């Protein structure tokens, strides 16, 4: 459409231009046309000749000579015509320029209008497309609304049917409700009658329970006071026990320092003995070389044969001593191997004991809960007894293991001290060569071989491991006792807060008492205290028997005193296993004449000055038999 309108406008503009040119085209006179037709190409020359100045014409006239007037007039007339034509043409040219300018302006206006029309057409087309899209979307929405309407109508019909069914059910439920209300009213009436009948009985029971709870509360107050007093006593005994332990540890540390100094001196003496042995070996090698050399032709003298016999005896004696030292070293290596095996067995036992202690710890945590305390008292009492028995068994096993380890270590110490003290048994010097120079007698000593070094290092490592294990057992038992105390405190708290509950005994070393339903008499608290004292006396007697057995084992020739690091692990909160070193040291002094060595004597003197901790029996009073006995 727009192109057609443009073509039409262009055709109309062309027509207007033609009409304008026809109107404004100049009308040429007839004389000029004639001159053009007749002269052809001459008019330009004529115009140019006509434009010449009059001087030229005059000169030409004078040159040509005299002419007639007619010819002059004929010449002037075309010149005038040509001037008029030129003027008319200049005017036409200016008019044409003006028309061109106006046409250009019209053309620009027409182009501007065409562009505006194009933009308007584009906008209309875009709007048309948008409207078409909107019409399509509206049609789709219309279809969707129709489908929704259809579904809504169907759902309305369904809900109407359902509402009718619900109304019918409501009527039935209301009828059922009325029936149930009538039944409920009858039941409530019967219950009220029964409650009135039972209220009289319950009042009597509550009064009797209140009286019983008051009695139990008074008994519990008395028991609380006793428990506080016993707790203060236990704290005082614990402080004394800790101070005593600190003093004993300081003593053992001093002993260990002395032992380390003595070991250093023994090492120095050992080095000196090694040097002597080297000298003796050199002298022996020289003697062997001399014996291997051929005898001189001169007859030997009598004193040389005596010296040779003496040297042979010396060689035999030195060889025997060396063989004995080799046997001793082999025996020490075997003892070290056995000791390592026993240490491994002890580590396995300790690991098993740690697992048992962890299981006991878990069971204690479970038993510490208040619900389990009051819901299952019989099971808890059984578990407590089992735990106490297990703890006692563990302590007995630990005591036996410590005694065995102490005896073994004492044997090893005595053997090593005897081996180190052997260099002091010299019997004077004798002549080694024919010149009569005196030399020290060969003294046997422990050779500085790798087996002896390994034995010493393994021995020290064993002591350190035993100290670590004893500390670990201490920590485990402290945790066990701490949880046991927490459990006892929780029981007392629950018994005080709930006077109608059932009470149980919470004793670490005492007997087992169950709480009954009936109240006890006034002398029950005294009986509980008597039970605690009896348990303590039994415990003390058992401890004395254990110490006596330890002393008897120390009097035997084989076992000895425990190492200082291990004695710290023997005091297991009431089971203080301490063995004196006096009897073993005295027995060794009687049997071994090798203790004349100056480095071995201070060890025995130190053990004699400090006879151990067996005489001071300090046992904490931890038998908490403070709860009342209830007889069935």
Curated annotation (Swiss-Prot):
Bilayer-spanning residue ranges: none
Keyword Nucleotide-binding: no
InterPro entries: GM130_C (IPR043937), GOLGA_cons_dom (IPR043976), Golgin_A (IPR024858)
Amino acid composition bias (Gly residues), ranges on this chain: 508-520
GO annotation (BP), single: Golgi organization
Region (Disordered): 1-76, 352-377, 423-452, 496-524
Pfam families according to UniProt: GM130_C (PF19046), GOLGA2L5 (PF15070)
PANTHER family attached to this UniProt entry: GOLGIN SUBFAMILY A MEMBER 8H-RELATED, GOLGIN SUBFAMILY A MEMBER-RELATED
Recorded family membership: Belongs to the GOLGA8 family.
Protein name: Golgin subfamily A member 8J
Species annotation: Homo sapiens (Human)
Gene name tied to this protein: GOLGA8J
């Amino acid at each position: 459409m727009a192109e057609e309108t443009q073509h039409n406008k262009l055709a109309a503009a062309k027509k207007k231009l033609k009409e304008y040119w026809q109107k404004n085209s100049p009308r040429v006179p007839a004389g000029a046309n004639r001159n053009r037709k007749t002269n052809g190409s001459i008019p330009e020359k004529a115009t140019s000749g006509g434009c010449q100045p009059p001087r030229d014409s005059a000169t030409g006239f004078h040159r040509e000579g005299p002419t007639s007037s007619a010819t002059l007039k004929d010449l002037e007339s075309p010149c005038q015509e040509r001037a008029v034509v030129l003027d008319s043409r200049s005017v036409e040219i200016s008019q044409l320029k003006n028309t061109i300018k106006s046409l250009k302006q019209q053309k620009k206006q027409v182009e501007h209008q065409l562009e505006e029309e194009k933009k308007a057409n584009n906008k209309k087309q875009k709007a048309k497309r948008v409207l078409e899209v909107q019409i399509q979307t509206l049609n789709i929405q219309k279809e969707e609304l129709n489908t929704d309407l259809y579904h809504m109508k169907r759902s309305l019909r369904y809900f109407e049917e359902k509402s009718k069914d619900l109304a019918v059910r409501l009527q039935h439920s209301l009828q059922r409700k009325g029936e149930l209300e009538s039944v409920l009213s009858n039941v409530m009436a019967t219950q009220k009658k029964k409650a009135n009948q039972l209220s009289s009985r319950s009042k009597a029971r509550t009064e009797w329970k209140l009286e019983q709870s008051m009695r139990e509360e008074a008994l519990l107050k008395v028991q609380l006071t006793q428990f506080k007093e016993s707790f203060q006593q236990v704290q005082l005994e614990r402080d004394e026990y800790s101070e005593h332990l600190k003093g004993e540890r300081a003593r053992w540390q001093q002993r260990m320092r002395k032992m380390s100094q003595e070991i250093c001196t023994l090492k120095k003496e050992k080095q000196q003995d090694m040097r002597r042995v080297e000298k003796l070996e050199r002298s022996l090698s020289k003697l062997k070389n001399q014996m291997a050399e051929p005898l001189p032709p001169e007859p030997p003298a009598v004193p040389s044969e005596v010296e040779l016999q003496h040297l042979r005896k010396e060689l035999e004696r030195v060889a025997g001593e060396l063989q004995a030292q080799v046997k001793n070293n082999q025996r020490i290596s075997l003892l070290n191997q056995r000791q390592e095996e026993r240490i491994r067995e002890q580590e396995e036992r300790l690991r098993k004991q740690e697992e048992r202690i962890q299981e006991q710890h878990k069971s204690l945590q479970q038993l510490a809960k208040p619900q389990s305390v009051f819901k299952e008292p019989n099971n808890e009492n059984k578990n407590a007894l089992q735990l106490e028995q297990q703890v006692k068994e563990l302590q007995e096993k630990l005591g036996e293991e410590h005694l065995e380890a102490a005896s073994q270590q004492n044997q090893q110490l005595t053997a090593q001290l005897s081996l180190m003290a052997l260099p002091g048994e010299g019997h004077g010097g004798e002549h080694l060569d024919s010149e009569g120079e005196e030399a020290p007698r060969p003294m046997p000593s422990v050779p500085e071989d790798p087996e002896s070094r390994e034995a010493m290092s393994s021995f020290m490592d064993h002591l350190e491991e035993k100290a670590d294990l004893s500390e670990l057992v201490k920590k485990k038992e402290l945790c066990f006792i701490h949880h046991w105390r927490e459990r006892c405190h929780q029981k007392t708290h629950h018994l005080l807060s709930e006077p109608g509950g059932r009470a149980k005994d919470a004793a670490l070393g005492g007997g087992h008492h169950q709480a009954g339903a009936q109240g006890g008499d006034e002398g029950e608290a005294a009986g509980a205290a008597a039970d605690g004292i009896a348990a303590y006396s039994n415990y003390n007697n058992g401890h004395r028997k254990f110490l006596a057995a330890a002393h008897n084992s120390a009097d035997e020739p084989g076992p000895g005193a425990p190492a200082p690091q291990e004695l710290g692990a023997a005091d297991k909160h009431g089971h203080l296993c301490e063995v004196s070193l006096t009897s073993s040291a005295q027995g060794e002094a009687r049997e071994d004449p090798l203790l004349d060595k100056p480095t071995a004597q201070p060890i025995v003197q130190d053990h004699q000055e400090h006879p151990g901790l067996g005489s001071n029996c300090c046992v904490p009073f931890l038998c908490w038999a403070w709860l009342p006995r209830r007889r069935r």
